UniProtKB/Swiss-Prot annotation:
Family: Belongs to the lentiviruses Tat family.
Protein's name according to its UniProt entry: Protein Tat
Interaction with the host capping enzyme RNGTT as annotated region, ranges: 49-86
Gene: tat
Subcellular localization(s) per the UniProt record: Host nucleus, Host nucleolus; Host cytoplasm; Secreted
Post-translational modification N6-acetyllysine, affected residues: 28, 50-51
Protein's organism: Human immunodeficiency virus type 1 group M subtype B (isolate OYI)
Start and end residues of each stretch annotated as Disordered: 1-24, 45-101
UniProt GO cellular component terms: extracellular region; host cell cytoplasm; host cell nucleolus
């Protein structure tokens, strides 16, 4: 390797930049022309800054939203409405009446 001038900034070192400038073309030839273009264009990986998304602000009338939630009917319990104790008794009765011997 050739010695690098220590006064040069690292991004200006020879070989630090691709020989041809990157462009916005996404054709196969441009996507595969160097490793940087392949990762950015071909694989879609970019490590740049991500823009912060603004969170949606709650409406000013937040109390009415709480009231509308309380008016909704309570969710129905799933499963056997009689309860788990009675269903166990049913299973016990069925096993007694069906002898497998």
């Amino acid at each position: 390797m050739e010695p690098v001038d220590p006064r040069l900034e690292p991004w200006k070192h020879p070989g630090s930049q691709p020989k041809t400038a990157s462009n916005n073309c996404y054709c196969k030839r441009c996507c595969l022309h160097c490793q940087v273009c392949f990762t950015k264009k071909g694989l879609g990986i970019s490590y740049g800054r991500k823009k912060r998304r603004q969170r949606r602000r709650a409406p000013q009338d937040s109390k009415t939203h709480q009231v509308s939630l309380s008016k909704q009917p309570a969710s129905q319990p799933r499963g056997d409405p009689t309860g788990p104790k009675e269903s166990k008794k049913k299973v016990e009765r069925e096993t007694e009446t069906d002898p497998e011997d």
